[in-house]
């Protein structure tokens, strides 16, 4: 048994505290909140909190349940948001990072992007998940105005991570159901970068016959491709799990490609452990698996 002198013990204790303080970063989630189901804010908040980052939220919409049930009620909170930002500014609230997800309207996008642009000037990192569609189709209610709104969000992003469908709509690129080549994937990333985002990932993309996530890291100028094995089941909220784990590791100063792979591995484990669940529409019970992150 090692017995340390009091001064040495205090030194080690203070070093430990300092490491934790340096690691902790405050993040604001601007996304919708579902009353029933682990998606969007309800999926991201417990993960980021578990990873040690104080997490705050601003709902862009209140949704009764996940949309996968086919019936839902939704409340657009744009009017509420317009009153929040002036109060926060008066109180001096600041965040190390902001993550945006579902945006309810073009008006809301303008308000949120203006706030993000203002915060970015103060050193805040902006993450944008341009939620609009999947499997070649836009979600119900998504219009050309929505796409333009998301382009406005990308203009202030340090990192965006659309899926393949969303990347195609954002860049006016034809969607290919059978997948694309690596050169075509890199061209998509270049187009996203041209819209304004510094770095970019594209998820749920088939590259040369392999399910992959592709990325561009503006800090190094590197492109990368990370293949994965697909589990043929669908859960709502897996993209939000990916986003939360990815952002959590990036806030811990992990390199983009490494953080992406870690997020992919967590999503795979979560899906694999829940693939036999009867009611998949409510998402994955995240709190049961936080120790796997």
Residue map of PLM features:
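Short, small-residue alpha-helix embedded
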Residues: 169, 233-256, 260
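Hydrophobic alpha-helical signal peptides and transmembrane signal-/tail-anchor segments
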Residues: 3-17
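Charged C-terminal helix
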Residues: 257-293
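Conserved N-terminal subdomain of the carbohydrate kinase-like
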Residues: 23-128, 132-140, 287-292
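Short pre-catalytic strand/loop immediately N-terminal to key active-site residues, enriched for Gly-Thr
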Residues: 35, 223-236
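Conserved phosphate/ATP/ADP-binding segment of small-molecule kinases
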Residues: 141-223
């Amino acid at each position: 048994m090692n017995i340390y002198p009091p001064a040495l013990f205090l030194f080690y204790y203070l070093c430990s505290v300092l490491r934790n303080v340096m690691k902790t970063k405050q993040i604001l989630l601007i996304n919708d909140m579902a009353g029933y189901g682990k998606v969007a804010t309800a999926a991201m908040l417990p993960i980021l909190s578990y990873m040690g980052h104080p997490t705050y939220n601003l709902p862009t919409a209140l949704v009764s349940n996940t949309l996968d049930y086919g019936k839902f009620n939704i409340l657009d909170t744009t009017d509420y948001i317009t009153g929040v930002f002036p109060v926060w500014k008066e109180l001096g609230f600041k965040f190390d990072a902001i993550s945006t997800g579902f945006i309810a309207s073009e008006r809301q996008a303008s308000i949120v992007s203006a706030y993000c642009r203002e915060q970015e000037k103060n050193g805040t990192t902006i993450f944008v998940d341009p939620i609009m569609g999947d499997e070649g189709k836009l979600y119900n209610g998504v219009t050309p105005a929505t796409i333009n709104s998301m382009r406005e969000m990308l203009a202030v992003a340090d990192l965006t991570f659309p899926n393949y469908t969303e990347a195609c709509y954002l860049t006016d690129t034809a969607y290919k159901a059978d997948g694309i080549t690596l050169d075509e994937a890199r061209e998509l990333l270049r187009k996203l970068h041209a819209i304004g985002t510094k770095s970019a990932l594209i998820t749920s993309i088939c590259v040369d016959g392999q399910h992959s996530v592709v990325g561009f890291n503006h800090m190094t100028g590197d492109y990368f491709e990370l293949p994965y094995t697909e589990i043929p089941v669908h859960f709502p909220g897996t993209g939000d799990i990916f986003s939360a784990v990815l952002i959590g590791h990036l806030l811990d100063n992990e390199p983009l490609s490494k953080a992406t792979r870690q997020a992919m591995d967590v999503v795979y484990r979560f899906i694999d452990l829940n693939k036999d669940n009867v009611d998949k529409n409510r998402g994955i019970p995240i709190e049961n698996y936080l120790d796997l992150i």
